Amino acid sequence: MGNCICGRSLDQYTSGAAATLGVLAGVPAAIVITHAAGAANIVNITFTVNDAAGVAIAKPAFIDVWLSDAATGLAITSHVADTITASVGSVWHVNTAAASLKVQTSAAGVATLVVTDTHKTAWYTCAALGIDPRPNVIHLMATGDFG
């Protein structure tokens, strides 16, 4: 049968540029992080898990999310938010209250966290796939990012 996974051809699992690299389509490879101001003192942060071709996966995935004082994502912030809840996906485990979480995305590979911070403290939002501990870090969140 040649190259196969569970009796199926690899062609069924690969697409686009990922196929030329031998990477499986639909396998979590990266996290895209975006944000938007919400209601007063709230920022909504959305995490989309993509495959190596940059296509959002169509299945749940686990990601680690934390707030950091460092642009590199090193360590958690010393100034935690008031609350962090999930409006899309779910929080599976709180490592450090309002600073570090394990999140499961929705069936569309998306999670949105609602962060409330009355002090609007500056911190970086970071996320990593369990299979790749290198953090994805977005810009410094500050007063202007909150509602």
Where are these regions (language model features)?
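Short, hydrophobic beta-strand segments
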Residues: 96-120
